[in-house]
Amino acid sequence: AQALIGAGGDISGANASTHVSFMESHDEERQGYEMIEFGVSSGDYDVQNELIMMERAKMGSAFHFLQPGPKMIWQFGELAYDISINQEGRLGEKPEPWGSEGLGYYEDTYRQYVFDAYSAILELRNENIDALTEGTFSSSLSGSLKQITIDHTDFKMCIIGNFGTETNTITANFPELGDWFDYFTGESMELEFSNVPVDLAPGEFHIYTNNIRGS
């Protein structure tokens, strides 16, 4: 949670093959709640803003699920559920995201964007699980600028993200030259250098792959 609220934090613990790693569980506050309650601000950028919180939830999911090893999603994390664990008491009934008396998450366009991002990220993971398991994994996950690189014969990936609250520049380390694609937008670029400086707004992240999505 420290990383997503904008206070720094190392997220390398998700790279584990001996146990299931997770961002949320039954006995911890939700990431969304932590961001809304304790998020850091800088100028006009405020992690406590609901829309910004949801954008950062997408970024967190990319950096969690695209590290090697088994992963868990705690219920409704894919919708950026942000109700406190202590609402109505620790074991009290919590509002559901659906139904006439629920939170309306499934009718909320922005919550659905989070759901769709989770789905796409997990699709990428599942389609390239051999690469995540057998490929060369490199990462820098302790600062506000974070990066993951996977280098495998059949699949290569570079993920960059700004977990801070101010615009910053990261040097993206691509494992090979040639054509690369932004996973979400499909935008292509031809690399002549493996180390590329990229300006990132706060909360901005990109997943680059050497194959266009769906190919």
What annotation goes with each model-predicted range?
Residues 7, 63, 68, 96-139, ...:
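Aromatic- and carboxylate-lined catalytic core of secreted/periplasmic carbohydrate-active enzymes
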Residues 42-54, 99-112, 193-196:
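Active-site rim elements
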Residues 19, 57, 111-118, 173, ...:
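A structural signal for well-ordered alpha-helical scaffolds and beta->alpha junctions
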Residues 88-96:
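Aromatic- and acidic-residue-enriched segments that line the glycan-binding/catalytic groove
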Residues 173-187:
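Solvent-exposed beta-hairpin/edge-strand motifs
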Residues 1-88, 126-154, 159-170, 184-185:
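Conserved alpha/beta catalytic core and glycan-binding cleft of carbohydrate-active enzymes
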Residues 192-215:
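C-terminal beta-strand-rich structural cap/linker in extracellular carbohydrate-active enzymes
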